[in-house]
Amino acid sequence: VTRPEEGALYDSIGPGYQTTRRADSHLAALLWDHLNGRPAGRYLDVGCGTGNYTAALSRRGGVWTGIDASDSMLQEARRAHADLSWHHASADNLPFPDSSFDGAMATLVIHHLQALPRPFQEVRRVLCGGRFVLFTAFPEQMQHYWLHHYFPGMIERSARMIPSESALRAALSDAGFTSVRVEPFHVTCDLQDLFLYAGKERPELYLDPAVRANISSFRTLCDESERVSGLGALESDLRSGAFEAVARRYASTLGDYAFVIADTEIQRHSLDH
């Protein structure tokens, strides 16, 4: 799924990853709904990591397979969920025959994929119908993260790695998907999966090194000087009460993340009749 150097990154992140990156139950429920999941369906998780969401959705139904480029992550997945199928593979060369699955998902992985639309073409190839559901952030949304105030370089670099909504729609269309729609997702204070903007309503989370260690942007895209100065400013603003004014300046109605739901031609026609 990931570029080679990022596979190595996640091999180093793997141990202890699940301490802060647990599957969020509400997010898992939304993924299942957007997939239009069926108990007898066959589903693929692209960039499954330690398999938290693969396992969470498998408990709702279906036969699940996960792929990832990180050996360490997959070892964690196999250890915790031996009953599911795990494969070391790249998203631009999926090791499955055509029409193997009834649906697929990819959560917070778009910034690690090789040049689009090739991975999307591969996902479309292995689907016999159904939907491809992505959970991602758009650069337009990230510009409204209050993290930008404290870690501007990190957020700018992170945003450059993610396709815009229009570019993502175009890549999915080029890959053969139809009826692409977007549903915004707003971070709440009870989010269990502590990814990049999970601390939107809980800024003190970013002061915890264990939380930052399992967020790839902090691991690889935040230089040491910005990390030190940003954390110092955040801690100072939290003590003084100035943080609330900073957060208000970044308020947005765009949502913090988004579900991108792409139908196959077969799925669309089945809905039309």
Name each region found by the language model:
Residues 181-273:
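Conserved Class I S-adenosyl-L-methionine
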Residues 108-112:
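Short catalytic micro-motifs in class I SAM-dependent methyltransferases
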Residues 44, 50-93, 118:
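Class I SAM-dependent methyltransferase SAM/SAH-binding core
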